[in-house]
Regions:
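Beta-sheet repeat architectures centered on beta-propellers
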Residues: 11, 23, 32-36, 43, ...
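A structural signal for short, well-ordered beta-strand segments and their strand-loop junctions
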Residues: 3-5, 50, 105
């Protein structure tokens, strides 16, 4: 399957017969009419996490078997209990699989927010990482030797001025 996100909805493209998708056997179906924002969605083990079209809500598009035995894709609001963290729009979202399942979010007001998301254990926990005099510009996850590494572009106020540089946040067991 191929998924297409627009500001008007989330679409699923699939072949009508077995094999590969071609112009002759292509089907396109609207899955939800939520709509996405301009930042790139991320793939997690359970679905596609994206920012809703107005820029301040995090959603997951995932396949579900519903109570009435119907099947299909639905979109769950992951940030419903953390709306106060996203008063300004979300700029970037990335996924760090190891050592923990964490979505990292940078907002347009230069804040860094983490979302520990372990769906099979029903864990949805937001945490902020915003020391004073610190502005987060961007974030990336890069595979490391043992774990995924979280890299940030950050400005810190030092000696009377902001200095911008790259930092890697490393997980170490206690």
């Amino acid at each position: 399957d191929l998924f297409i996100g627009t500001n008007g909805g989330e679409w699923r493209c699939f072949q009508s017969e077995s094999g590969v998708i071609t112009p002759e056997n292509l089907n396109i179906e609207l899955q939800t009419s939520i709509g996405g924002y301009k930042c790139k969605p991320v793939i997690t083990p359970h679905g596609i996490v994206f920012v809703q079209k107005h820029g301040a809500t995090i959603r997951e598009l995932a396949y579900n078997v519903l109570a009435n035995s119907t099947e299909g894709y639905s979109s769950e609001n992951l940030s419903i209990l953390a709306e106060h963290l996203f008063e300004n729009n979300i700029k970037r979202i990335v996924y760090q699989a190891e050592p923990y399942s964490i979505l990292w979010i940078v907002t347009e007001d230069f804040k860094l927010v983490g979302l520990t998301y372990i769906k099979e254990h029903e864990i949805i926990a937001f945490h902020t990482h915003n020391p004073s005099n610190t502005l987060y510009h961007d974030v990336a996850v890069i595979p490391g030797f043992l774990n995924d590494e979280l890299w940030v572009t950050v400005s810190r106020y030092l000696d009377g001025q902001y200095k911008t540089h790259q930092e890697v946040l490393v997980w170490r067991p206690l």
